[in-house]
Amino acid sequence: MPRRGAEGPLALLLAAAWLAQPLRGGYPGLNMFAVQTAQPDPCYDEHGLPRRCIPDFVNSAFGKEVKVSSTCGKPPSRYCVVTEKGEEQVRSCHLCNASDPKRAHPPSFLTDLNNPHNLTCWQSDSYVQYPHNVTLTLSLGKKFEVTYVSLQFCSPRPESMAIYKSMDYGKTWVPFQFYSTQCRKMYNKPSRAAITKQNEQEAICTDSHTDVRPLSGGLIAFSTLDGRPTAHDFDNSPVLQDWVTATDIKVTFSRLHTFGDENEDDSELARDSYFYAVSDLQVGGRCKCNGHASRCVRDRDDNLVCDCKHNTAGPECDRCKPFHYDRPWQRATAREANECVACNCNLHARRCRFNMELYKLSGRKSGGVCLNCRHNTAGRHCHYCKEGFYRDLSKPISHRKACKECDCHPVGAAGQTCNQTTGQCPCKDGVTGITCNRCAKGYQQSRSPIAPCIKIPAAPPPTAASSTEEPADCDSYCKASKGKLKINMKKYCKKDYAVQIHILKAEKNADWWKFTVNIISVYKQGSNRLRRGDQTLWVHAKDIACKCPKVKPMKKYLLLGSTEDSPDQSGIIADKSSLVIQWRDTWARRLRKFQQREKKGKCRKA
């Protein structure tokens, strides 16, 4: 039988949706006529630039299971259909039997192919009257943006009815719309309340579409955006975007229309005439994809999900896919696709995160921060070399070998961090080279790890033979060493200190020779607490002239001496009583033994 009761543009919308139903129902034979050519992706324009795209408008209820709280036929029961002939009402009674397909009225008839010439109707048990109710619950399978909910009746329309929606797959329910001739009594709502910007996300109650007539074929159609003040600017109305979103729809029939004869003597016949019967339940809308997909598909688990584009992800394309966090996720609009943008990590990172503060500081252009930069890079964009590496300017920053190791010399360099651009290591005094691996001009290598390069003396220091004539009384003044001298525990114990020195340079200072020496090892400490490193050695000019001690530049010696005050109150003094012997490497072990014996108090016995 033809539909009646739809009004205005909504009727055209419902008609178009009804005509589209067979195509949605799955007739594979129709596909043989389809042109087998690749269709352009609606989510991108002809230049490949992203643009808003939305799935097709569908009747999302078609073919889906509806859970109902009451269905006639279990056990078989009588029902009577009321028709009007003039002013007379005529009842014709029938049997509802769930086990007989010809007499059954199952819930599947709510969402099957609706053929006006062969109506199939779901039907409830007779006379389920207020305060009892009958509910129809439909799961859409995922979030949809619902445009309308419509029901076409085989019975008179309910006197009171409510439509609810769920956004969390039936865990909680929110009112969508109320219909009643007594809104205040049934739902504690005023009838036909004005919709304003302040309450446009609230359900209202209306007494329209609640007449008892027509007795069959009546339509109730609820438009989710009709009369909502900001519907014209839906893209910029998060309130309405949330309002139309649903995963489930529930219809509650609260109160039957009656003719007032249900309490008369033959009330049993009358009560068998009052029931709810619906030939078609439609939920028109689009798969919710936030403007980032043009269709919904089945995933591996057979769940309905958006086929996301614009680098988005999620069942509703409601987040950016991994590594595309350079700006925050946004819903696409007619003006801006708001695609997610990949982080700029110069091919050195696989993960990143979004930082709102950086995004704001950049003028809302970039907020991505790269995580775990590889290939020896560092920084928010993996755009410079980490400590200990420098840029190889012959390669782009995106190259996996864009950063080279500094390779600073472990002795010549003052640290392992080099210049990020040139690779120049920080060199110690007198050291040069990009890795600090050689002595600078005017310097020569030493064996000291502290000062590996020392300045070359301008001229060799004068010796006793060249600078000062040997005094005539040297034989009576001191006894110069001749041949090889030996060291023993007794000699070691008699002296205040014992050190290995390297003579670096010498200069005359009045009656003294001032030697710059490098103390390589300390085998015995005096009161002045000698330490390794550069030190000043003072020797009286007469002692040098008499060759006691006899020293030469750039030679190493073992010096055993006594603690005396030096001319400038710094350094150490060697005199004719000091023991200065050219160094032999074999002495190191013997001197360590002397040192251990001294610690045990052996020097006091010697």
From Swiss-Prot:
Domain Laminin EGF-like: from-to ranges: 287-342, 343-405, 406-455
Pfam families: EGF_laminin, EGF_LMN_ATRN, Laminin_N, NTR
PROSITE patterns according to UniProt: EGF_1, EGF_LAM_1, EGF_LAM_2, LAMININ_NTER, NTR
SMART domains registered for this protein in UniProt: C345C, EGF_Lam, LamNT
Presence of keyword Disulfide bond: yes
Domain Laminin N-terminal span(s) in chain numbering: 49-286
Entry-linked Gene3D superfamilies: 2.40.50.120, Galactose-binding domain-like, Laminin
Principal location: secreted
Glycosylated position list: 97, 118, 133, 419
Alphabetic keyword roster: Cytoplasm, Disulfide bond, Glycoprotein, Laminin EGF-like domain, Repeat, Secreted, Signal
Chain span(s) of sequence motif Cell attachment site: 532-534
UniProt KW Glycoprotein keyword: yes
GO CC annotations, alphabetized: actin cytoskeleton; basement membrane; cell periphery; cytosol; extracellular region; glutamatergic synapse; nucleoplasm
Signal peptide: 1-25
Disulfide bond sites: 121-154, 287-296, 289-306, 308-317, 320-340, 343-352, 345-370, 373-382, 385-403, 406-418, 408-425, 427-436, 439-453, 474-546, 493-603
Domain NTR: 474-603
Domain of life: Eukaryota
Single biological process term from Gene Ontology: regulation of synapse assembly
Subcellular compartments: Secreted; Cytoplasm
PANTHER family: NETRIN-1, NETRIN/LAMININ-RELATED
Role this protein plays: Netrins control guidance of CNS commissural axons and peripheral motor axons. Promotes neurite outgrowth from commissural axons but acts as a chemorepellent for trochlear motor axons. These effects are mediated by distinct receptors.
Protein name (record): Netrin-1
Gene this chain is encoded by: NTN1
